[in-house]
Each structure stands twice: as C-alpha cells, then as structure tokens.
Design a protein with these regions (language model features):
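Helix-breaking motifs and short loop linkers at transmembrane-helix boundaries and internal kinks
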Residues: 38, 70, 90-96, 234, ...
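Conserved MFS/SLC helix-loop-helix module at the cytosolic interface between two early adjacent transmembrane helices
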Residues: 57-94
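C-terminal transmembrane helical hairpin of 12-TM major facilitator-type secondary transporters
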Residues: 270-317
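Cytoplasmic helix-loop-helix junction between adjacent transmembrane helices
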Residues: 99-142
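Helix-to-loop junctions at the C-terminal end of transmembrane segments
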Residues: 58-70, 255-269
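A late C-terminal transmembrane helix in Major Facilitator Superfamily
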Residues: 323-362, 369
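Helix-loop-helix hairpin linking two adjacent transmembrane segments in secondary transporters
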Residues: 127, 135-183
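Extracytoplasmic gate region of multi-pass secondary transporters
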Residues: 26-27, 203-245, 249-256
Length: 388
C-alpha cells in the first residue's frame, strides 16, 4: 500500500513538473522572443496575456472533460498538447503564430489542476490525501525553475529555440510514460459533473471567492518580487532573482508542510484543513505589512521566505478544502472552478498593485495584498462555521 502511494504521487508530481516546464518556458523566454521578433514591451505582454487567456478559457471545459472521461486520458492528452504547443512556439516564423501557439499552450495547461487533483483524491487514502496534494503542488515552482535554466541556459550554447525544444521533448516523454504507467493506478470513468449542485453549494462558492483573493496574492507577489528588490531595496536584478527563488522554494515547503498538517492534526478533515489554511493566509496577511520594513537584501530574503511558507504555501490546502466540500464526482470541475477564480485574481491583482505603487508607494501595494489575505481568511472561517 505504501509503495503504491509513493508510486502514484511520484507519477503525478512528475507529470506536474513536466507540464510546468512546458508552460513556464514562455515566461522564461520572453527576452528571447523579444530579440527574435523585435518585439516591444507591449507586444511581449501580449504573449503572456494570450498564454493566460488560453489557460483561463479552457479550465472549466477541461475540468468537465476530466470528470467525464477520467484523468488518465485528459492528463495524457493534455501533456501531449503542451509539448506540441511549446514546440510550435520554437517553430513559429511570425509573431502572430507565436500568439496562436501561446494560446494553444495555455489551453492545454488548463487540465493540470483538475486532472492532478482528481488523480490524488480518487486514488489516495483519505488519511494521506492532503500531504499528497502538497507534494504534487511542488510541480509548478520546480517546473518553472527547470524551464528557466533550460531556456536561458541553452541559448548561449546552441540557439534560442533549443530550450523550448528540450521542454517539448520532456513533455512528450513524460506523456508517454504517464499513459502507460497510470493504467494500473485505479483510474475510473466518471459521469457529467453536477453543475447545479456546485452552484448551490454555499461553501464551495465562498471558497471560490477566497481563491480569487489568494490568486491575486500569489500572482502579484511572484510578479513584483524582483522589481521590488531592485527598486526599493536597491539590489541588483540577479539578487532579486535569488529572492524570488527563495520565495518559490519556501512556497513548495509550505505546501508540503501544510498538507502534512492537514492529514495528521486531530479533528474532522473540514476543521483541520480549514484551520491550517486560515493560519497560513492570516500569517501571510501579517507578513505583507512587514515587507516595507526590510531594508537589506538579507532582510528581504527572510521576509519573502516566510511569505512563501505562509501566503504562497496555502495553494495546496486551498484545493484540499475544495475537495472536502464537494462530492467526489465533481472534484475535477470544482478544482477547475477554483483555479479559474485564482487566475482571475491574477488578472486584476497585479494592475491594482501597480497602480497603488505608482500613486502612493510600495507600502500601499503590500497593504492591499495583506487585506486580500485577511479577506480570504474571513471567507474560509465562514465555511468552517457553516455547513453545506
């Protein structure tokens, strides 16, 4: 039983890492695309926006497909599509085709959250589900780090498309491995999700609202860390990149630790998972108020490490909590809805933070994120105190 658990979690985590290597290659390669096609900063922004729109547009449809056809099919096809998408970016002869490829790439990444969550909750014993979610959620930051090394590292040795092509090869290899290896992992066919039930589930809707706040916090923090360290602390861009790496590393640690606590603490699953999630988000809210007090790179590194552990580390338990308040047959669609909310938060959070920073200062921006964290805590507490 223990061997099967680690085999399954390792397989799902490997899938998540490979998918993230393909998806985040675009973020790592923005400067390469700029130089290759002579893009302006606005045009580079369009690439990222198109990628994100593709992701957001297909989250719910792919969540439905996962509930209907099973995660083995959707995750295998999804990773194959990601590999093709990142390869098309490398092969695109014009900027317009880069945008088409970016949209395709983003759309296939939409299967990641509903598919991997369903794989965990359908096949892992309830006593170990939350730490399994925490472990597989290490995939995005690890995949992002790997793609950064591939895309920016190989350009000086080979050609600018090399990193994208290697990412595509990784995606193809892992997609094949996953399709073969997951066959005996206990996948099952599911019926169409109960949308009426989800819309009538007060706890789920409150968590979706909380996810919007947490998503805004996550995307804004990761997007502005390097810039803040450079402009406010006065450190070099490379130092800001190091602080960002620390933030991501502690984010991974926070997800694993929170998942473990969600499994081993006493009490009902709803109570212990919701409580740990509340503590993480509240801790993040307090820490955001301390960011302006950091005056050296070391102090910034410490504060952002703690932010990773608390604010960004809450991602895993957020999906765990969603799985508790919905039925098993609806986990794929419910997870997709939660991720859609987080992505929506990522669309409005950074511009709002930027506006506050320009008009008032960074302190106002960090207080804004702290307020969103506290709002998320309030919504989670309402779910804890209420019932479906």
């Amino acid at each position: 039983m223990r061997t099967r658990y680690w085999r399954l979690v390792s397989l799902i985590t490997t899938w998540h890492v490979a998918a993230s290597v393909c998806y985040y290659a675009v973020f790592a390669g923005t400067t390469l695309l700029r130089d290759a096609f002579g893009l302006s900063p606005v045009s580079v922004g369009f690439v990222v926006t198109t990628l994100t729109l593709g992701y957001a547009a297909f989250l719910l449809p792919l969540g439905v497909a996962t509930d209907r056809f099973g995660e083995r099919r959707t995750l295998s096809v999804g990773l194959l599509g990601l590999a093709v998408g990142v390869a098309l970016i490398a092969a695109a002869p014009t900027f317009e085709l880069v945008l088409v490829a970016a949209f395709l790439l983003g759309s296939f990444y939409g299967v990641a959250t509903p598919g991997t969550n369903k794989a965990i909750f359908d096949n892992v014993d309830p006593s170990r589900q939350h730490r399994a979610i925490g472990l597989k959620q290490v995939g995005p930051p690890l995949g992002s780090a790997i793609s950064s090394v591939l895309v920016t590292g190989l350009v000086g040795v080979l050609f600018w498309q090399a990193g994208f092509l290697v990412a595509a090869a990784v995606g193809l290899a892992v997609a094949s491995l996953f399709y073969v290896a997951y066959a005996g992992a206990g996948a099952s066919e599911a019926a169409y999700p109960d949308f009426r039930g989800l819309l009538g589930n007060r706890s789920y809707l409150l968590l979706v609202a909380a996810g919007t706040c947490l998503g805004a916090v996550f995307y804004t923090t990761t997007g502005y860390t390097v810039l803040y360290v450079e402009e406010s602390i006065g450190a070099a861009v490379a130092v800001g990149g190091l602080v960002l790496a620390v933030l991501q590393a502690f984010s991974s640690a926070g997800r694993v630790l929170a998942g473990w606590l969600g499994d081993v603490l006493p009490g009902e699953p709803r109570t212990r998972v919701g409580s740990v999630l509340s503590v993480q988000a509240l801790g993040g809210g307090v820490l955001f108020l301390l960011v302006p007090a950091a005056s050296t790179p070391l102090e910034a590194g410490v504060v952002f490490a703690l932010l990773g552990l608390f604010a960004l580390g809450s991602v895993g338990l957020y999906y765990s909590f969603i799985s508790i308040v919905v039925s098993e047959d609806d986990i794929g669609s419910a997870s997709a809805g939660g991720q859609f909310a987080a992505t929506f938060g990522g669309l409005f959070g950074p511009p709002a933070f930027g506006y506050l920073t320009e008009s008032i200062g960074y302190g106002a921006g960090w207080r804004f994120l702290g307020g969103l964290s506290v709002l998320a805590v309030g919504l989670v507490i309402v779910v804890l105190l209420g019932s479906r």
